[in-house]
């Protein structure tokens, strides 16, 4: 599949803003290993092969195991994830699939049990940012590894 256009060259100003948002997510309170997991899960849900690939590679660089990476897609049925990671993955799914059910109260309660108010805002910003990246990459058919 060929990319439809190079969005970095097509709108440098817009991409500068996206890069600034991405940089911000790295400075928030969510640990890098968890950020990679939520980026992978949101990218899977959005059908973004480019971002799923990129963040899986990043996760391995941070020491993530292949076994856990393979299980992200079925995290609910896997014992590989901590309560904090499970809460973050549930929150990621709810925020990513917002139009389906908004964010259910039980998902919010699970997230609040694991994250402070500030951390939950930070997590939501990270989920929002990866969703924006996914929409760019999917819309313009950015190929994995490219």
For the regions a protein language model found, what residue spans apply to each?
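Hydrophobic alpha-helical segments
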Residues: 1-146
């Amino acid at each position: 599949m060929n990319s439809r256009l190079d969005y970095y060259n097509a709108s440098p100003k817009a991409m500068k803003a996206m890069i600034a948002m991405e940089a911000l997510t790295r400075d928030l309170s969510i640990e890098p290993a968890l950020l990679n997991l939520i980026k992978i899960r949101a990218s899977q849900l959005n059908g973004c092969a480019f971002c799923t690939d990129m963040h899986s590679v990043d996760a391995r660089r941070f020491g993530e195991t292949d076994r856990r990476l393979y299980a992200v897609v079925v995290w609910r049925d896997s014992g590989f994830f901590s309560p904090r990671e499970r809460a973050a993955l549930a929150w990621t799914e709810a925020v990513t699939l917002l139009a389906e059910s908004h964010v259910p109260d039980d998902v919010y309660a699970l997230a609040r049990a694991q994250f402070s108010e500030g951390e939950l805002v930070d997590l939501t910003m990270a989920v929002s940012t990866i969703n924006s990246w996914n929409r760019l990459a999917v819309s313009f058919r950015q190929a994995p590894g490219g």
